[in-house]
């Protein structure tokens, strides 16, 4: 209803629903076989790539969540202080990640920040890690490993940084 892209949150919810369908997935596994996946050659490098990919995806997830809060605050005239919200999460929420300190700092630098990805700290982190996200998502797709949140993070980044989205193609088909 807010008109904010929260595709990672939606993908995570969908993955949770799918995880509950064990019996159906077991039946499908016997019917819809995929080719064997070759083993990873360099486990240490692969683990580092996954760590970096997850970090980039986490930034996108928080960017989407805080964009949703920003939009709701503007739409409903709530005057939410997003930096304070991040600090509250850090102090007493189940999340309590050190990463929330970086979010608090971003909103302290710019209280009107529309998206975390526009903050220098976060766009530098994305620049340093987005290729790992792209490689990890591609590996998952190649091997048939479902990575809905990770692939949505990559799609979001690609759409967010592009002045022209696929909507132009949809409009051309009308």
Specify the residue positions occupied by each region the protein language model found.
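NAD(P)-dependent dehydrogenase/reductase Rossmann-like domain
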Residues: 1-174
